[in-house]
Design a protein with these regions (language model features):
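Short histidine-centered catalytic/ligand-binding loop motif
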Residues: 78-85
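Generic structural "secondary-structure junction" signal
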Residues: 43, 71-74, 151, 173-175
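Basic, often amphipathic N-terminal segments
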Residues: 1-65, 86-145, 163-180
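A short, Trp-centered hydrophobic/proline-enriched beta-strand micro-motif
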Residues: 4, 11, 148, 153-158
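Short proline/glycine- and acidic-rich turn/helix-capping motifs at secondary-structure junctions
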Residues: 68-76, 111-116, 152-163
Length: 180
């Protein structure tokens, strides 16, 4: 994942807090760090840290933009802030997917290169249902979701029994800027 810069992190947390106050939503707090997910590795069958370190050291920080409010539909819909997919963001995802996600037992097919939609989760899980999705979208639809951000890190999140999701390691993107 990439954690968000401070201003966008604060914007997303304010939305999370507003939805918790108004609708009682708390599922998003299971991973209490606003972030962009590139892939999910559920089992550590290989040593992934050196792969992530190599990608981080060879990738320069990149500029991205949030552009819209979206919904992944289905039995358990997800409301998200969508990012415009640009070539640098797609290249970072490609590097992570091919070097990391293809090398492990990855059950999160939604993150493969064909299906991946870069996004920041706003609401998911059992919080959303047919009776509240309309009022939630009505509340969110009039907010400005256009933000420019610098993606400057790759962060490894890990589920620790008794603690929940924690930051295991945060790596700075440190590749040469002149190549881009």
């Amino acid at each position: 994942v990439s954690l968000l810069p401070r201003d966008l992190d604060r914007f997303v947390r304010e939305i999370w807090d507003e939805l918790k106050t108004e609708f009682g939503f708390d599922s998003v707090f299971l991973t209490p760090f606003p972030h962009i997910t590139y892939c999910i590795v559920e089992e550590r069958k290989t040593k992934i840290d050196p792969l992530i370190e190599a990608i981080a050291s060879n990738t320069p920080p990149l500029i991205a933009r949030t552009e819209y409010l979206g919904v992944f539909s289905g039995e358990k819909p997800v409301i998200f802030i969508g990012l415009a997919r640009n070539s640098r963001l797609a290249s970072l995802h490609h590097a992570l997917w091919t070097e990391l996600c293809d090398s492990v037992d990855n059950r999160a097919i939604a993150y493969n290169e064909i299906h991946w939609i870069p996004h920041i989760t706003v609401v998911f899980g059992d919080d959303l249902n047919r009776s509240n999705i309309g009022p939630v979208m009505e509340r969110l639809a009039f907010k400005d979701f256009h933000h420019e951000l610098t993606i400057d890190n790759l962060t490894i999140l890990e589920e620790v029994p008794g603690e929940g999701i924690v930051i295991r390691e945060k790596l700075r993107l440190a590749g040469p800027l002149e190549d881009y």
